[in-house]
Design a protein with these regions (language model features):
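C-terminal membrane-adjacent module
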Residues: 142-225
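C-terminal ends of transmembrane helices
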Residues: 21-33, 78-89, 140
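Central hydrophobic cores of alpha-helical transmembrane segments
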Residues: 40-45, 96-105, 150-162
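Membrane-helix interface and helix-disruption motif detector
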Residues: 2-15, 33-38, 51-71, 88-95, ...
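Hydrophobic alpha-helical transmembrane segments of multi-pass membrane proteins
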Residues: 13-23, 42-52, 72-76, 164
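Alpha-helical transmembrane segments in multipass membrane proteins, preferentially the mid-helix core
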Residues: 77-84, 107-111, 129-151, 169, ...
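Aromatic-anchored segments of alpha-helical transmembrane domains
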Residues: 47-54, 102-112, 158-168
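N-terminal juxtamembrane cytosolic/stromal segments of multi-pass membrane proteins
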Residues: 1-2, 7-8, 19-20, 24, ...
Length: 225
């Protein structure tokens, strides 16, 4: 870069990109005898942030830098936190912690975006919390100690009902009227959205009933023995 352009123009971008690639091979873990997965996750995340920061400086676009870093952090948190907690005393609650942390980070992401681009952040946070409810409640149910088939059936049924009414909740929170739950299987052109939602609702509830039925049967069989 110095020889050709007589300045350090693209040098730092290439250097940060090489560091990012170096961390993913992975090479930083060779310097540690333990907790290599933690070293890998931290080093790769920081190297990505370094590359993004370098690009942001060169493009004068620091407004999106923190947004990108938080978004990537959400992905890392969802993948690695359950793994890190799997061998601890709180391993039963790993998914509760993971989904709750993801919800908090998503809210922080919305707040950060709101700082640079004004929008209705409070309704956005409310619908985010609503969308995370099935995941968090399902994680709580899975942490309880009872029949696995019953837990699966309850989680599917609860999540199905909550997500079925997502568009309705969005309309109520944002004051719109865009969702339609009208069902008419003889007219798919105008009622395709409602028809598909209804079919998914029935299929998923049927699956949940099947799981619950198997769970009850296994419990009854166990009690008879």
């Amino acid at each position: 870069n110095l020889a050709i352009n007589h300045t350090l123009s693209w040098f730092f971008i290439v250097l940060s990109a090489l560091i990012c690639a170096y961390s993913f091979i992975p090479n930083f873990t060779f310097f540690f005898n333990s907790k290599k997965l933690l070293v890998f996750s931290v080093s790769t995340y920081l190297s990505i942030c370094l590359l993004l920061f370098t690009c942001a400086v060169y493009t004068n676009g620091l407004t999106w830098f923190l947004t990108a870093c938080i978004g990537i952090l959400i992905g890392y948190e969802v993948i690695f936190v359950p793994i890190f907690l799997s061998r601890t005393k709180i391993s039963r609650f790993k998914f509760i912690i993971s989904f709750t942390a993801a919800c908090v980070l998503t809210i922080l992401l919305l707040i950060n975006i709101h700082i640079w681009n004004s929008f209705r952040v409070v309704p956005a946070i409310l619908i985010t919390c609503y969308a995370f409810i099935p995941a968090i409640i399902s994680a709580v149910i899975c942490a309880l100690r009872f029949n696995a088939f019953l837990k699966a059936g309850i989680c599917i049924a609860f999540s199905t009902v909550v997500y079925y009414f997502t568009n309705f909740v969005v309309d109520k929170i944002f004051g719109t009227n865009n969702s339609s739950y009208k069902v008419n299987f003889s007219n798919w052109q105008q009622y395709s959205n409602g028809n598909i939602h209804f079919i998914c609702l029935i299929l998923l509830l049927s699956i949940s009933i099947l799981f619950i039925g198997v769970g009850i049967f296994r419990l009854c069989k166990k009690n008879d023995q």
